[in-house]
Amino acid sequence: MSTMPEDIAAAQRLEQACQSLGLAAGAEQQEKLLRYMAQMQRWNRTYNLTAIRDPEQMLIQHLFDSLSVVQPLVRALQAGQPAKVYDVGSGGGLPGVVLAIVQPEWDITCVDAVEKKTAFVQQMAGTLMLPNLHAMHARIERVAPADCDVVISRAFASLHDFANLAGRHVRPGGTLVAMKGKVPAEEIEGLPAAWQVERIEPLQVPELDAERCLIWMRRSQGTL
């Protein structure tokens, strides 16, 4: 089967995005990332995994956006070390599937309350041969504490609800990480007392002219 020009262009743009983000993603990993996007487009026609349907915007707002958090997480978790990560409210696996592809030493679980979305993630674990990727159909507040190094969310809830519902899955010394657009000052002020913002890290998403940041949160001193 011949390769379409738009596929070649997407591959070139992905390679450039990885370079600009400082990611050493190999050819096989980049191919899996593009296959993941193609499968999301295909499933989206039937199962409505995401409101974004344009392939161009999916590449930027889903794939590149998710890739932008990899290096910050690598720095926090120490490169090459195993880590346990929960992606809460993962939807179709963003950023969890992307993390599983580019960081095979991390054990990634994508948690979502919508069964068709976790079914898609489970399918991707098999299709893309990702033994480190798992899907969990559940409400995060009903899941037994998981003792994670990082619990991350991209479009799950306010910081208050994220900390209240998912914070118990973070091991002592671990981190809650929220992917946000503009710095959510009001949400930060509304954080539960048990959690505090450690730092706010600006993100630069390739080809996206919009504000993005990571909110890093740890337990307040004296809390378990």
Curated annotation (Swiss-Prot):
Its main location: cytoplasm. Belongs to the methyltransferase superfamily. RNA methyltransferase RsmG family. Disulfide bonds: none annotated. It is found in: Cytoplasm. GO terms for cellular component: cytosol. It comes from the Bacteria. Keywords: Cytoplasm, Methyltransferase, rRNA processing, S-adenosyl-L-methionine, Transferase. Its EC number is 2.1.1.170. It catalyses: guanosine(527) in 16S rRNA + S-adenosyl-L-methionine = N(7)-methylguanosine(527) in 16S rRNA + S-adenosyl-L-homocysteine. It is an enzyme of class 2 (transferase). S-adenosyl-L-methionine binds at G89, L94, I140, E141, R154. The keyword Methyltransferase applies. Specifically methylates the N7 position of guanine in position 527 of 16S rRNA. GO terms for molecular function: rRNA (guanine-N7-)-methyltransferase activity. The gene is rsmG. Pfam families: GidB (PF02527). This is Ribosomal RNA small subunit methyltransferase G. Coiled coil: none annotated. PANTHER family: S-ADENOSYL-L-METHIONINE-DEPENDENT METHYLTRANSFERASES SUPERFAMILY PROTEIN.
